[in-house]
Structure formats: C-alpha cells, structure tokens
Regions:
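N-terminal domain-start motif of subtilase-like serine proteases
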Residues: 2-46, 66-80
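Short, well-ordered amphipathic alpha-helical segments that serve as non-catalytic structural scaffolds
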Residues: 25-28, 92, 127-130
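Subtilisin-like serine protease catalytic core
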Residues: 34-45, 52-64, 72-124, 140-143, ...
Length: 210
C-alpha cells in the first residue's frame, strides 16, 4: 500500500512547445464521430491525477472534485499535469477560438487529486481516489476513468498488487478504465502498474516521432 507512483513523463522537461492534439484527432477520426453528434455529451470522465484548474475550456463542466492529498475543497492543480490531461480529454477550445479542442469537448469531468505538486503519490491515495469514484459514479454519471500515472519496478509487476485489484474493481463495476503504459518501452517489463491489468485499456504512444 505504500508504493510510490509518479507521472508517466516529466512535465517540466524543456522541450519545444508543440501541440499534437489535432494530429491525433485526425488519426483516430474524431471528426467522423462529431458528424454523428458524438462529442461526449452525457458522459462524465473521471481523471485521477494532480487535480484540475478550472480552465475556461472546461470550468463549467467540472462536475465533481476530490482532493485525497491535501484535502482542499475546491478544484485546483498545483502541478499542471491533471489540467493538461483534462484539456486533452474534454477541452472546448474556447480560449484558442476552437483551434485546440479536446477529444470529447462535450463531456463532463470529475477530477480527483491523487498526486502532489511534484507529480508523486502513493498507491493508497490512488486507491482512495478509485473508491471516491465508485461511490459517486451513478450520481455524477461517471463512465470512464483515466489514470495517467504508474509505478515501475518488478515488485509492482504482479496482478495481485493492490493497484491492479483497484482498477479491476472499477472495471467490474461497469467503468471503462484507461491507463498509461509508461514511457520506458518497448521492452520486457516496461509497462507500469496498474497498466499490467488484463481488464483495463492500457495505452502507449502510437507514433515514435511525436
């Protein structure tokens, strides 16, 4: 239960500022879904991360917030990663006049802060966040859970680990759980926990040049 988790990549790394969201949207044919009226409306996505700043692109669609780290009441993000993830998932593009829009701009978001300002956290906090989601999934209409964090190390590479059992419990409760694979692959044992679960959707990069 004391296992340490971290973000799947360092958000403070000094790299050229580029946006790949629009290119990815073309790759997965988001526009086709939009023409059918599928924008995420009516679906709440829970994001287990560093929290969420009430950004103008989605501030009126944060339907729930919990802070299991500092126990503060209102939405905030002292790291930035959780806000970044919420923007990719459900940003409206309002600030950029529609130029940078998330994948599901009509969805609502339930942000659960399980990581601290440095992007680190514990398995216990992630499990507490999953418990919060399960308790409120019907009330908030949560159907999807995004977890862009993970734990490396052979000790965590077990389907009997508490983290894997936690995400499996969410899946068995009818939630679609999407977890980051990590950034150390492709190589044996490079997928982080809880991405090793056989039940969840574990996602890695689809383009080596991104």
């Amino acid at each position: 239960m004391g296992k340490t988790l971290s973000l799947e990549y360092p958000i403070y790394k000094r790299t050229p500022r580029k946006s790949y969201v629009n290119r990815v949207k073309e790759q997965i044919r988001c526009r086709d879904a939009y023409t059918l009226g599928l924008t995420g409306r009516g679906v709440c996505v829970a994001v287990l991360d560093t929290g969420a700043y009430p950004h103008r692109d989605f501030e009126d669609r944060i339907s729930g917030f919990a802070d299991v780290v500092n126990h503060r009441p209102g939405p905030y993000d002292d790291c930035g990663h959780g806000t970044h993830i919420c923007g990719i998932i459900g940003g409206s593009g309002a600030v950029s006049d529609g130029r940078y829009q998330g994948m599901a701009p009509g969805c609502t978001l339930a942000a659960v802060k399980v990581l601290d300002r440095k992007g680190n956290g514990s398995a216990a906090d992630v499990l507490a966040g999953i418990g919060w989601i399960l308790d409120r999934k019907d009330q908030l209409g949560i159907r999807i859970v995004n977890i862009s964090v993970g734990s490396y190390g052979k000790r965590g590479m077990s389907e009997d680990s508490a983290l894997v059992k936690g995400v499996n419990r969410a899946w068995d409760a009818g939630l679609v759980v999407v977890v980051a694979a990590g950034n150390n692959g492709p190589a044996p044992l490079s997928v982080t926990t809880p991405g090793i679960s056989r039940k969840v959707i574990t996602v890695g990069c689809s383009d080596d040049h991104m």
